[in-house]
Amino acid sequence: MKKIVLAFSGGLDTSFCVPYLIDKGFEVHTIFVNTGGITKNIEKQISNKSKKLGAKKHHSVNVETKLWQQILTPLIWSGSLYQGKYPVLCSDRYLIVSEAVNLCKKLKTNLIAHGCTGMGNDQVRFDMSIKALGNYEIVSPIREIQAKVSDVRNYEIDFLKGRGHKISSSNSKYSINENLMGVTISGSEIDKWQEPKDQTYVLCNKPNKYLSLIHI
């Protein structure tokens, strides 16, 4: 059985990837790379979820200091903002790939998987970083099913429920990425270019709920 390293966040996409890859005949080793923004309790929940999904072994690595030193500090110095609006917080993907590749070396495998879809920039960040670090074979389960079905999230939910796995309501609706630099949220009405509902906000309120400034 071939070993494969899966970059694992515990969200819907990467949760789907675990049993999907097992069905394909892989021995799945998950790795969660902590780039900040989560508690120890959540990190433990992610580990437990990986094991319940059937991963052979779960690995957790903390790179908060690396993120601060290698990415966040240079971004602050340069004043660089994504589309002139917010820090490129998804640049933590490069550190995630680096740690996943390190695990590949330890396990003596060249197989690496991620849960990126085929419609965003994350797939480019992951794929190009992996290719830059060596001769690794990339397995992308979400892109594979996107070629066959149109409603990917519901397909993933049905797939997991069919194998007895519970799905939280937030997982089923939104994909949330959080680290030291901020939060990105996608899915549901957001992907349809509609205004997100109040419960989607993680670190702040909607602008119309901001406190009014008092001028003296």
What are these model-derived regions, one by one?
Residues M1-I214:
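Nucleotide-activated chemistry modules centered on ATP-dependent adenylation/adenylyltransferase
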